[in-house]
């Protein structure tokens, strides 16, 4: 991205995507800004009237009347300014609510929901760029747009004072426009690259924080420091390139401010000396244009805020660009857990397999075969070819959420960050005796009783303070409450005592749940049969010895290869 040419059109595209749905707030803020800018001219115009008329009469009544009108106009400015601030605060709340809702939906409906597996977990750090958008938009609407509008109005009014002022204002606008054109593309691209460098550094620090003490050794510490220095150097270098453009613009605007202020005084003085301009007009022009010139001197700061807004909008657009799965809305889920795969191909794996409803098989799987099958059953991936049926029907005809409620895959030790009570309530709203019996069945009753907060213990994403085996047992207890039609258990369940696992499977058997138990210890349990789940061939056996013979033969073939 650092070398990609980005321009104003790209910036408008990102801003439209992020801010566009809430643009009504921005438009209303701009309307208030227009009114405030027009009313703000009351002061210089009042001064001009004071000098040209009131001073000549030397009477207090016109002075009081003029001051009273000015006070009323300024109080109206105060009221409109307060309303504008209130509207922008509403914009911040509305923007936050909408972005949170949309990102949640896009994450839930992601085509590939395993963000951590693809090293994309840091993608959601982009959410914090929302704060920049929240603060930059009101600042630009209230500050920058006010400056621009007051400049337009002020330059228009003073242009009618004298043709020389008109020419002066045209040159001033041309100079401002040239400063914007010359450095805008480099500044926009540099701001986006700088934001990316910031997130790369944050991703690295996040990985250090999640290393669980891995870097607490001399060799690993050296690597961590070198990597930190590398991401720091990358950020500093990127910031230096961006600052080159932004600083050049800032200096250019400051120079315009200096030359324009001096030039106005020189031109105004010359016109007064020639009798072509009144003193009141010069004072009014100075009051109007001095504010314009000061605003020009602040353009560099506001453009920096604009570039940050563009970069943050680009980062947020990455969340909106998460590929979404095609949602198929049926009106039902599978009738039972029967599974049939006929020449189903996915990513180099081929499956031809049939399971009856309620069957439970001890399964020995080749590396990768179990994971691909799980992706197919949960419809996280679609077959490249072949036919897949669950409950006698094509999974594409089901309500996708009903399907994923009825098909459960437990093959990871990670768990949602919630309390144990909240996690169990995802399966059953009432933590009655059934839930307690499920915990007792998997052997967690005593362990949970030993925790200081019991069921209210907060779980980390790794399951801590529970061990890996205990976390998998908790997930199995959840499955006992859900009673899915089809359940695939990964090899991590080898960590559970066989008698606990057998007891849980008996309960599932009573409810008609089809189970594939992938294990590295097929001799520990005796179920309805045995399955060898290969990448290209699947074979069922009635006897353990036959399964072990095939597994040993393939292991010997792999070793010789």
Protein language model regions, located:
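Cytosolic ends of transmembrane helices, especially the final helix of ABC transmembrane type-1 domains
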Residues: 220, 244, 292-322
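Transmembrane helices of ABC transporter permease
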Residues: 33-34, 66-77, 81, 142-193, ...
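Membrane-integrated ABC transporters
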Residues: 1-42, 56, 60-66, 88, ...
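Transmembrane helix-loop-helix hairpins at lipid-water interfaces of multipass membrane proteins
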Residues: 26-80, 87, 158-164, 279, ...
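Hydrophobic alpha-helical segments in the permease module
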Residues: 69-81, 172-175, 249-260, 266, ...
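An intracellular "coupling" helix at the cytosolic face of ABC transporter transmembrane type-1 domains
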Residues: 21-24, 112-113, 125-137, 141, ...
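Juxtamembrane loop-to-helix connectors within ABC transporter transmembrane domains
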Residues: 47, 106-153
